[in-house]
Regions:
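A short beta-strand-loop structural module common to alpha/beta enzyme folds
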Residues: 60-71
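Glycine-rich phosphate/diphosphate-binding loop of Rossmann-like nucleotide-binding domains
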Residues: 39, 43-55
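Compact, glycine-rich, soluble single-domain proteins
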Residues: 95-118
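Short, structured active-site "lid" loops
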Residues: 77-95
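C-terminal segment of N-terminal export signals and the immediately downstream linker at the start
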Residues: 22-38, 49
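N-terminal secretory signal peptides and thylakoid transit peptides that target proteins
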Residues: 1-18
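Alpha-helix C-terminal capping segments
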Residues: 84-89, 104-112, 128-132
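C-terminal binding/interaction regions
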Residues: 122-179
C-alpha cells in the first residue's frame, strides 16, 4: 500500500476502516434545488443552522417543522417532508432527529422514498450515486453543524449514476415496494 494510502487508513478496534476524508472544504452545491427539511425536538437545534446554510447556497427551503423544542412525534414530521418530495415540491428532503435512525425508518416506510442515514461524506454522496436516495437523515446528537455542512455538500452535489447496474437495482427496489 503506498505511503499516502497507508497514512489515510484508520483502524477502529483493530479493524481497517474507511480512509480519512480529504481536507477539502465543503463546496456550495452546483445546482440549486427546492428542498424540504424537517426535524423533531431533538433535531431542532441543528435545523436552523442547516436551513441558513442551504439558503446561503441558493436553495429554496420548505420548513416542515417542528418549530420549537417541544416534544413531537418524528413520524409526523417525516411524513410532511416525504409528501413534499413525492409531490415534486422538493427535489430532495432532509430530516434531523436525535440519532437520525427514527427519521430514516419513518422515511423508508413511505412508498417512493429512499432514505439514508448519513453521518459521513462518503455515505452521503454514495447513497445518491448508487441508490438514488431522495431523503437524507442526520442525527443532531451525533454530528454538529460543521460535519452536517460537509455531509449536506456531498449529498446535494451527488447525482444518480447513469450506469445500468445502479438503475436496475433501484427499479428492483421499486418493485419490492409493490409487494
Amino acid at each position: 500500500m503506498p505511503d499516502e494510502a497507508m497514512r489515510r487508513r484508520r483502524f477502529l478496534g483493530g479493524v481497517a476502516a474507511a480512509p480519512l476524508a480529504s481536507a477539502a472544504q465543503p463546496r456550495p452545491t452546483e445546482s440549486k434545488m427546492p428542498l424540504a427539511i424537517g426535524c423533531d425536538h431533538a433535531g431542532f437545534p441543528l435545523k436552523g443552522p442547516v436551513i441558513a446554510l442551504l439558503k446561503s447556497w441558493g436553495h429554496t427551503v420548505r420548513d416542515c417543522g417542528t418549530f420549537s423544542e417541544d416534544p413531537v412525534d418524528f413520524p409526523d414530521i417525516a411524513k410532511k417532508v416525504c409528501d413534499e418530495v413525492l409531490a415534486g415540491r422538493a427535489q430532495r428532503g432532509i430530516l434531523v432527529c436525535g440519532t437520525g435512525v427514527g427519521a430514516c425508518i419513518a422515511g423508508n416506510k413511505v412508498r417512493g422514498i429512499r432514505a439514508a442515514l448519513c453521518h459521513d461524506t462518503y455515505s452521503a454522496h454514495q447513497c445518491v450515486e448508487h441508490d438514488d436516495v431522495n431523503l437524507l437523515c442526520m442525527g443532531a446528537w451525533i454530528i454538529g453543524p460543521k460535519v452536517a455542512e460537509e455531509v449536506l455538500s456531498a449529498y446535494l452535489n451527488a447525482r444518480f449514476s447513469t450506469s445500468e447496474e445502479f438503475r436496475r437495482r433501484v427499479r428492483k427496489l421499486g418493485e419490492m415496494e409493490k409487494q
